[in-house]
């Protein structure tokens, strides 16, 4: 079985850095600043609408912020218990993967920082913002394995529901516990230990 993680907001605490970068360049790139902390109940699509960004602008903006994020990737830390969770799952015989919009370089810097590089055998970086459904479907075909996905956003839940992949949501990322629980009842973990125990029970 593969345990596949989202990166931003699930493995890596990028919320503050990401929010800062997005708002820092708002005037230059022509969109409205967003108070991300006050809008954790909003989906990515709702936040895009609030910012005034047009959907055709999204690919270019993502490329821009991937580059900026790589420049500061060394600042990114793992959430509490995540390195230990990854090691414990690997030791139990689970295969590990990552599917994310984040750049391969940022992921590599992060995994090297925590000595986790060799534990992940499937990494699909730089997918489009709303391309997770397709990426998960392709992973199932390629890996020929059962998958459990670990993510922090509503769009993770939507992608997994569309591909019939079970998901464990985590409460420490982009979306609030309340909105995750509403959309993925009984499967929202508040700690890395809860993620581990939920996987083992499955």
Residue ranges of model-derived segments:
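Conserved Lys-Pro-Asp/Glu-containing loop-to-beta segment of HAD-superfamily phosphomonoesterases
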Residues: 2, 132-157
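N-terminal helical cap/lid subdomain that shapes the substrate entry/recognition surface
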Residues: 2-84
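A short, structured active-site edge motif that brings together acidic residues
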Residues: 35-39, 117-130
